[in-house]
Amino acid sequence: MPEELTPTPETAVVEAGPVSRWLSENGFENTALERDHLGVEIVQVDREVLLPIAAALFAYGFNYLQCQGGYDLGPGQDLVSFYHLTKVSDDASQPQEVRVKVFLPRHDPKVPSVFWIWKGADWQERETFDMYGIQFEGHPNLKRILMPEDWVGWPLRKDYISPDFYELQDAY
């Protein structure tokens, strides 16, 4: 009797949602990922096509960047920059939402800034840079926002080693 293969989350086929289908129909490469626990559609895109896809989604009505953030998949694995977008309209009782994810190699965590599409990305991209070291190319003021400017490393990376001592400088 042949052995049956049980799909894992990495190999399971995910049905493309309406946003993923719209992107594909309009020539934008993307991969549909499993929806989150609230049913929000998630699409994965390559960093090289993030800006054209972001501009297309803005034109499609996703005019509000609800959240931009990052996370670390683990030591030696990718970093992820994500964008939670919402269609804000007159009928906002059930706004459409989508989350866009860009997986970045740990040794080269660079992605274009979406600041020029959604101004709200300003501080959010700075925080993601400060905590994970993801470089947002084209950001007008990419510098640390939470940690001291001379801080070494990226505190929320899973391979980060905390310094034994850090001396705060007096403000005067």
UniProtKB/Swiss-Prot annotation:
The keyword Thylakoid applies. GO terms for biological process: photosynthesis, light reaction. Pfam families: Complex1_30kDa (PF00329). It is found in: Cellular thylakoid membrane. GO terms for molecular function: NADH dehydrogenase (ubiquinone) activity; quinone binding. Gene3D superfamilies: NADH:ubiquinone oxidoreductase, 30kDa subunit. It is an enzyme of class 7 (translocase). The keyword RNA-binding does not apply. GO terms for cellular component: plasma membrane-derived thylakoid membrane. It catalyses: a plastoquinone + NADH + (n+1) H(+)(in) = a plastoquinol + NAD(+) + n H(+)(out); a plastoquinone + NADPH + (n+1) H(+)(in) = a plastoquinol + NADP(+) + n H(+)(out). Its EC number is 7.1.1.-. Its main location: membrane. NDH-1 shuttles electrons from an unknown electron donor, via FMN and iron-sulfur (Fe-S) centers, to quinones in the respiratory and/or the photosynthetic chain. The immediate electron acceptor for the enzyme in this species is believed to be plastoquinone. Couples the redox reaction to proton translocation, and thus conserves the redox energy in a proton gradient. Cyanobacterial NDH-1 also plays a role in inorganic carbon-concentration. NDH-1 can be composed of about 15 different subunits; different subcomplexes with different compositions have been identified which probably have different functions. This is NAD(P)H-quinone oxidoreductase subunit J. The gene is ndhJ.
